[in-house]
Amino acid sequence: MEIGQYQPNLDGDGLRIGIVQARFNEPVCNGLADSCIEELERLGVTGEDVLLVTVPGALEIPLALQKLAESAQFDALIALGAVIRGETYHFELVSNESGAGITRIGLDFGIPVANAVLTTENDEQAVARMTEKGRDAARVAVEMANLAVALEQLGGDDEEEDEEEEEA
């Protein structure tokens, strides 16, 4: 049996990407942003097609993502932040709530959201992960934006066929 397959597409040319970056644990978050933006550029996303918004901390990320999603100006969104257990007594709350909120935005608005909010035990773990996780977020955003477009086109073909049948 032969099956259809979609090949991952990492061509960022023409894609609009919105990034929400937390400022809490700023050195780590800046490292995430730098590597993410560098990778977006490498994938063909231009600077004029990227909007970076900063918020106080991880719990504020979902609201900013929601506002960007509501604008309908972006093909994908990226969440950047760092929740470090030693930095806050309510680590689990911040980690769980920010993660759930970030996921909900993607599902509620039908827009890909790459979640690069690090949750680590200490600063050393966060620093060790920030560069690769920032790059990963860029790749996820571009790949999923292209996948979303391809999957939407599948649905669009059926609608056109239905309209043609109704006219006949």
UniProtKB/Swiss-Prot annotation:
UniProt xrefs under InterPro entries: LS, LS/RS, LS/RS_sf
Under the heading Gene3D superfamilies, the entry gives: Lumazine/riboflavin synthase
Q: Which residues form the signal peptide?
A: none
What is a single molecular function from GO for this protein? Answer: 6,7-dimethyl-8-ribityllumazine synthase activity
The biological pathway it contributes to is:
Cofactor biosynthesis; riboflavin biosynthesis; riboflavin from 2-hydroxy-3-oxobutyl phosphate and 5-amino-6-(D-ribitylamino)uracil: step 1/2
| EC number annotated for this UniProt entry | 2.5.1.78
Q: Name one Pfam family in it.
A: DMRL_synthase
Give any Gene Ontology cellular component: riboflavin synthase complex
Chain positions recorded as (2S)-2-hydroxy-3-oxobutyl phosphate binding sites: E87, T88, R129
Active-site residue list: H90
Q: Which GO terms describe its biological process?
A: riboflavin biosynthetic process
Which reactions fall under this protein's catalytic activity?
(2S)-2-hydroxy-3-oxobutyl phosphate + 5-amino-6-(D-ribitylamino)uracil = 6,7-dimethyl-8-(1-D-ribityl)lumazine + phosphate + 2 H2O + H(+)
Q: Where does 5-amino-6-(D-ribitylamino)uracil bind?
A: F24, A58, L59, E60, A82, V83, I84, N115
SUPFAM superfamilies, per this entry?
A: Lumazine synthase (SSF52121)
- What are the entry keywords? Riboflavin biosynthesis, Transferase
The record's section on NCBIfam families has: lumazine-synth
Entry's PANTHER family? 6,7-DIMETHYL-8-RIBITYLLUMAZINE SYNTHASE, 6,7-DIMETHYL-8-RIBITYLLUMAZINE SYNTHASE DMRL SYNTHASE LUMAZINE SYNTHASE
Q: What does this protein do?
A: Catalyzes the formation of 6,7-dimethyl-8-ribityllumazine by condensation of 5-amino-6-(D-ribitylamino)uracil with 3,4-dihydroxy-2-butanone 4-phosphate. This is the penultimate step in the biosynthesis of riboflavin.
Of which family is this protein a member?
A: Belongs to the DMRL synthase family.
- What is the name attached to this protein's record? 6,7-dimethyl-8-ribityllumazine synthase
Its gene is ribH
